[in-house]
Amino acid sequence: MASTRKPSGHGAEVEAQKRSSSNSSTKSAKAETFEPMQLQRSVTNPRAVGIPESKRLPESFRKRSSDPAVCKPDFSSLSTVLEHVDSLTIDEKKTSGFGSVKTSSASAKLSDGTSSLGKTSGSAKLSGRLDFMESGKSSICRGSTSSDVSDESSCSSFSSTVNKPHKANDLRWEAIQAVRVRDGLLGLSHFRLLKRLGCGDIGSVYLSELSGTKCYFAMKVMDKTSLASRKKLLRAQTEREILQSLDHPFLPTLYTHFETEKFSCLVMEFCPGGDLHTLRQRQPGKHFSEQAVKFYIAESLLALEYLHMLGIVYRDLKPENVLVREDGHIMLSDFDLSLRCLVSPTLVKSAAIESDPLRKNVYCVQPACIEPSCIQPSCTVPTTCFSPRLFSSKSKKDRKPKNDTANQVRPLPELVAEPTDARSMSFVGTHEYLAPEIIKGEGHGSAVDWWTFGIFLYELLFGRTPFKGSGNRQTLFNVVGQPLRFPETPVVSFAARDLIRGLLMKEPQQRLGFKRGATEVKQHPFFEGVNWALIRCATPPEIPKPVELEKGAVSVAEAPSSQKTAAGLVLNAQKGSDNYLEFDFF
């Protein structure tokens, strides 16, 4: 089994893993079959979840589930259950002589027997693949000192509410609410753990089913004693509070959370489509087409805009953390490194590009402007940059003067919701995605998200990050000291390269999005033609193939690649003998 690395240093720990090269091979072990475990009804402490005494249902009104898995447990404790599941789903990590990680993963078929999953009629189809695939980006996190705690926990508080308007038609949400109305409180006794999806820095995640339904969830189980001893309680609390505050189509849903004497559990959305890193590896040339990139980038941008509006600086955007739902749309994940702060959304009058001398020559707003030489102000008129005006033969002297006041269209006010006052000294993120101001220790704010957004865009287009070196040290040096360069292939539009240039300005004050956030980024010509209001109606570049769950057995649909990854799960291994696993799902 994978061992958890002990924290190093006095309050400063590094969580690093070596990103495997694109040519590293992944071996899939033969599927194995095992009997699922029966769960013991746990005793949930009402005070632990904050239910007032007056609102607790009497014990006589709490109906017991008819599921035999709940009424007749085979295990004496949750620890035994989890240990038994873990022993059946171990992913063996092998390190090659070149430092690349080879993953031997078991796609286990679940034979349910007499459990409630087998009793449900028909087969449950989950769009996506249960793929297991390695991920190699080096993630680092300097442990919070007392100053970090005050810096990142004394900001705005997040309210916990069960009101989720975007989940009005979600069957899983309705099932959770029905159980809550019936039993008052949800606990481990209401779920059956089907399979361990993976383990990570602060917990393990299990594919689980709400007993008596066909509703599947990803349950993150964290050992509270381990979190306390490793000083990770703040990270776990931050993640839970952020998840509670979210209600957005491209962000995860926290359906419920509860605690036992030993464990803290988060029940979240199960994304069976994998992540964008895995999906990119399966593309020709291991990079996406520009049209596909525009789709994924646009949805990620809306998610970042929403987070910033709530005063949340994400700080961990990368393909491994962008999951693909069953319908092909995306969902950001993993919020334990996020920074919370105060923000004041305001409506400001928008000025035309021509009236702002600082923005006038930044980029050419015409789609035809694909050459770097075409960046003069004349490109802002609605004509092509390659030839003279074909439909106007009159010179400027012959033209009649226009009434500028009458013809000028007043722009609508813009919503600016950028936490520009956010400030942190923490050293967190992924080596290849770290912003220069983080590396130099100058303190950072929300502009780091626009830097990572640029790296993210670059990787999806070109199949690699722009500043990756031979090692982590060289990578950090390149981020700070090396200029941005673009490869000759694949060929991308000037608008795409110009957007990357604006996002990857090394000085945060000059970075695109620094002042007006997502509003400024969305106005870039790269996004021309994107209908932001109806983006959820757009057809995704790829819709995952279905995974059938019938009679308790997991059957992975045939994939175009032999590499199978767990739904939205990425296991990172540190180079060396530690065999340390970092879980990048949540």
UniProtKB/Swiss-Prot annotation:
Domain Protein kinase: 191-527
Domain notes: The activation loop within the kinase domain is the target of phosphorylation.
Reactions accelerated catalytically: L-seryl-[protein] + ATP = O-phospho-L-seryl-[protein] + ADP + H(+); L-threonyl-[protein] + ATP = O-phospho-L-threonyl-[protein] + ADP + H(+)
Biased composition (Low complexity): 19-28
Gene Ontology CC annotation, any one: nucleolus
InterPro entries per UniProt: Kinase-like_dom_sf, Prot_kinase_dom, Ser/Thr_kinase_AS
Protein name: Serine/threonine-protein kinase D6PKL2
Main localization (coarse): membrane
Catalytic activity, EC: 2.7.11.1
Compartments (UniProt record): Cell membrane
Compositional bias annotation for Basic and acidic residues: 53-66
A Pfam family recorded for this sequence: Pkinase
Gene source species: Arabidopsis thaliana
Compositional bias of kind Polar residues: 97-123
Membrane topology: Peripheral membrane protein
PROSITE patterns registered for this protein in UniProt: PROTEIN_KINASE_DOM (PS50011), PROTEIN_KINASE_ST (PS00108)
GO annotation terms (biological process): auxin-activated signaling pathway; basipetal auxin transport; phototropism; protein phosphorylation
Family: Belongs to the protein kinase superfamily. AGC Ser/Thr protein kinase family.
Binding site for ATP: L197, G198, C199, G200, D201, I202, G203, S204, V205, K220
Location of the active site: D316
